[in-house]
Amino acid sequence: MSEKGGKGLKSSLKSKDGGKDGSSTKLKKGRKIHFDQRTPPANYKILNVSSDQQPFQSSAAKCGKSDKPTKSSKNSLHSFELKDLPENAECMMDCEAFQILDGIKGQLVGLSEDPSIKIPVSYDRALAYVESCVHYTNPQSVRKVLEPLKTYGISDGEMCVIANASSESVDEVLAFIPSLKTKKEVINQPLQDALEELSKLKKSE
C-alpha cells in the first residue's frame, strides 16, 4: 500500500521504544531470530487435549505396557517365609561357627572322595563370612564368661549377639538388644563385668 493511500492505516505491530513498526524476527540491536519451522520429530505429535492430559505423547507411551511387569519378571521374584526354629536348634556365636567350618576345611580332600557326601556351594561363603567378623579364637572361654548371665534372664541367642557384636559398653549392648532394656537395673553390673572379661580375651588372643 502506498504512503498516500495508507495514512489512516497503521501497522498493528509497533516496537515499545520508538513507536516504529517492529518485526518479530528482529531484536533491538538488529540481530535476526530464526524460527525453526520444521515439523516435530516423527515419534512425537502435538495433540489437542484437555488440561488434565499431557500436551505431548510419544509413540512409546501409546502402548501403555512399558510399566507393566512381564511374565518373566514375575517368575524371577522369590517369596520367602519366616519359620520358627526347631525346638532343638541352638544359637551359635561367630567364633563357634568358624571353629566348626574351619575344622571341616582340613577334611575337604577326604570328604570330596566320598560320593555320599556333598559339600554345599555356600560352604566357602559361610567360612569367609565368619572368618571376617570373628573376634575370639577360643569359643569355650567366651562361653564361660557369658554363661553366668543366664541367671539374670539372658537367653542363648542374646548371649551370641553380645559376643558377636563385641560391644564395649552396656549401652551398646542395649542398642543391639532392645529387649534387655527392661532388665537394665538388674543386669547392668553383671553385664559390665562380662564385657570387661571379653575385652581381656580379645587382647590376649
UniProtKB/Swiss-Prot annotation:
Output compositional bias ranges, type Polar residues. 48-60
Q: Which family does it belong to?
A: Belongs to the eukaryotic RPB4 RNA polymerase subunit family.
Q: Report residue spans for region: Disordered.
A: 1-79
Q: Report the protein name in the record.
A: DNA-directed RNA polymerases IV and V subunit 4
User: Which function does this protein serve?
Assistant: DNA-dependent RNA polymerase catalyzes the transcription of DNA into RNA using the four ribonucleoside triphosphates as substrates. Component of RNA polymerases IV and V which mediate short-interfering RNAs (siRNA) accumulation and subsequent RNA-directed DNA methylation-dependent (RdDM) transcriptional gene silencing (TGS) of endogenous repeated sequences, including transposable elements. Required for the de novo DNA methylation directed by the RdDM pathway.
Show the GO MF annotations.
Answer: nucleotide binding
Matching InterPro entries, A to Z? HRDC-like_sf, RNA_pol_Rpb4/RPC9_core, Rpb4-like, Rpb4/RPC9, Rpb4/RPC9_sf
Q: Which gene encodes it?
A: NRPD4
A GO biological process held by the record? DNA-templated transcription initiation
| SMART domains associated with the record | RPOL4c
Q: Which PANTHER family match?
A: DNA-DIRECTED RNA POLYMERASE II
Task: Please tell me in which tissues this protein is expressed.
Answer: Expressed in shoot meristematic region and in root tips. Detected in cotyledons, flowers and young leaves.
Sorted keywords for this record are: Nucleus
